[in-house]
């Protein structure tokens, strides 16, 4: 039995333990210093507070002070913390990570370094490792696709995708982790998977705004939402292509699939609903933070702009929806519907 250590006991970190255990892995779950109350609930036999689902049987739990023990002898490591915590956790875990056969990443977002550079998470991890003096980082597998943590934990049918520059590694792990309810595609388009992962969070805010406008006015805004969805996929595709990704990745489960599920019920969508109903972006974010609901699309939006400015400045004017969401998040847009509409409705021929 191979050993896999999941770093991060939040919704996704705990949820992925279910298919891992079902697939026959020896699973370890390490919680950060922010996860103590989550591990407490699991140890009491309660449902996980974030997924409201029973926790997988047979998984060994480790507290934040037990990182070395959690990583000892691990064949594979999964980073599953919020994007803002990736740098710190990776630095702490590097001595164990470099001994593993592969590093999987379910975290979604960009990372900004002290010098202002903004990179996708796999490239960020490679830089962190190099800066810390490690040149033996194992292959990185980007985990993407439409996976709601609560449904994954409940063994509901779920499609995901493993993206690794070494396709053989992606296929190997897809075969080793797949279960009857957790189906996995394999691709060598790591970049495409990682572009879609944070960008769909940004665009899901706009989808939520359309739903919020409907709640506020009582008038359906399905047309606006559909146009927003279409524009979001287009922008994910052209941004990915500019970085060497397959243009079709955005039209598969990393893009269309993940955007669909996030736009239906994700935290980023619900944040957008609040804005569409009339709440200020700052106030809505504070309320969701009070409820322990992380809205990763907010920091991702600002970092996406910096990423574009650094890596694809020629695309700035070709990403109107990204720019519109950033404007809305600034709190300076009075007519949110008009601003989103300007970004997604076709221009006059």
PLM feature spans:
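NAD(P)+-binding Rossmann beta1-loop-alpha1 motif at the extreme N-terminus of oxidoreductases
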Residues: 1-54, 59-62, 92, 97, ...
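Nucleotide donor/acceptor-binding cores
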Residues: 2-3, 101, 158
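Short beta-strand/turn micro-motifs composed of small residues
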Residues: 8, 31, 107, 144, ...
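Electropositive phosphate-/nucleotide-binding environments in soluble metabolic enzymes
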Residues: 10, 14, 36, 61-64, ...
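Rossmann-like NAD(P)(H) cofactor-binding subdomain of soluble oxidoreductases
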Residues: 60, 67-72, 76-155, 173-175
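Internal alpha-helical scaffold of NAD(P)-dependent oxidoreductase catalytic cores
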Residues: 96, 130-139, 157-249
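NAD(P)-dependent Rossmann-like dehydrogenase/reductase catalytic/cofactor-binding core
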Residues: 200, 205-211, 226-234, 241-349
């Amino acid at each position: 039995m191979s050993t896999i250590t999941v770093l991060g006991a939040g919704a996704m970190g705990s949820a992925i333990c279910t298919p891992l255990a079902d697939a026959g892995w020896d699973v370890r779950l390490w919680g950060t210093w922010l996860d103590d109350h989550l591990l407490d609930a699991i140890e009491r036999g309660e449902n996980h507070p974030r997924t409201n689902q029973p926790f997988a049987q047979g998984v060994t739990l480790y507290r934040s002070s037990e990182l070395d023990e959690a990583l000892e002898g691990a064949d594979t490591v999964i980073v599953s913390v919020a994007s803002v915590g990736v740098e710190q956790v990776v630095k702490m875990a590097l001595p164990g990570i470099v001994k593993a056969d592969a590093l999987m990443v379910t975290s979604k977002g960009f990372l900004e370094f002290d010098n202002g550079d903004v990179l996708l998470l796999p490239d960020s991890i490679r830089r962190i490792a190099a800066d810390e003096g490690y040149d033996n980082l194992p292959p990185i597998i980007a985990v993407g696709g439409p996976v709601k943590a609560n449904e994954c934990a409940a063994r509901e049918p779920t499609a995901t995708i493993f993206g690794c520059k070494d396709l053989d590694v992606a296929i190997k792990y897809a075969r080793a982790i797949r279960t009857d309810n957790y189906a996995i595609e394999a691709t060598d388009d790591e970049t495409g998977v990682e572009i879609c992962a944070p960008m769909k969070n940004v665009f899901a805010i706009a989808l939520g705004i359309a739903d919020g406008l409907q709640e506020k006015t009582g008038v359906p805004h399905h047309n606006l939402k559909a146009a927003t969805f279409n524009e979001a996929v287009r922008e994910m595709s052209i941004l990915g292509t500019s970085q060497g990704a397959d243009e079709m990745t955005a039209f598969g489960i990393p893009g269309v699939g993940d955007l669909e599920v996030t736009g239906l019920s994700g935290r980023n969508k619900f944040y957008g609903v609040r804005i569409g109903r009339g709440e200020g972006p700052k106030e809505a974010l504070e309320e969701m933070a009070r409820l322990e609901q992380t809205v990763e699309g907010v920091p991702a939006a600002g970092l996406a702009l910096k990423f574009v400015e650094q890596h694809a400045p020629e695309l700035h004017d070709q990403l109107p929806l990204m720019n519109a969401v950033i404007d809305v998040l600034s709190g300076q847009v009075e007519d949110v519907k008009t601003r989103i509409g300007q970004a997604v409705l076709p221009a006059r021929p």
